[in-house]
Regions:
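Polar/charged heptad-repeat coiled-coil helices used as signal-transmission/dimerization stalks
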Residues: 1-183
Length: 183
């Protein structure tokens, strides 16, 4: 009904069949409204991040409501699992992990693709820093980090390259000093 008040009940105090009809209509309408309200309560919990609740099981053709709620919950649990997997991998320093974006559609797919991009950028940039540090450890002071980096990765590149330049200068000074020593 188009009115603003959906809680109005038909008076049931009519005599005979009219009272029974009013009671039957009220029962049907309010069973549906109660089911919808219960589903909305669960949906609000899902929106707040609480995925522990299940929608009320409904009989017959009304089962479509809890089936839709179950599908929404399954989708939210699946995206949550992917995010937890990537977050755990990143916290453990394993940026080679990727989420399965093809399992999702629309914004969920975009979310996983963006997380995968973040993991890929971190993996590549940290990998380059690791290669530079390995080269320095092996005595190669010609190695540098080159490329487009942003934010903390740009600072790491610049700091690493400055460190190599400083080490090169120090080693050069030591070599010059050692060459001037006569025995």
């Amino acid at each position: 009904h188009a009115g603003p008040d959906i809680s109005h009940r038909i008076p049931e105090d009519f005599p005979g069949v009219y009272g029974e009809l009013a009671q039957g209509i009220n029962t049907v309408i309010f069973e549906h409204l109660d089911s919808i309200r219960a589903a909305i309560d669960v949906l609000n919990q899902y929106a707040a991040g609480n995925l522990t609740l299940d929608a009320q099981r409904l009989p017959g053709t009304r089962a479509f409501l809890h089936e839709a709620m179950d599908a929404a919950k399954a989708s939210l649990l699946a995206i949550n699992t992917q995010i937890q997997h990537l977050a755990s991998a990143a916290a453990a320093g394993d940026f080679s992990q990727r989420g399965d974006a093809d399992r999702f559609d629309h914004d969920f797919k975009v979310m996983i693709e963006q997380l995968n991009s973040m993991m890929q950028v971190a993996d590549g940039n940290l990998g380059q820093l690791s290669q530079l540090l390995q080269a320095i450890a092996e005595g190669d002071l010609t190695a540098r980090m080159d490329g487009q980096f942003h934010g903390v990765f740009a600072r790491m590149r610049d700091d690493a390259n400055t460190t190599v330049a400083q080490l090169t200068q120090i080693v050069g000074q030591i070599q010059a000093s050692a060459g001037s020593i006569t025995l």
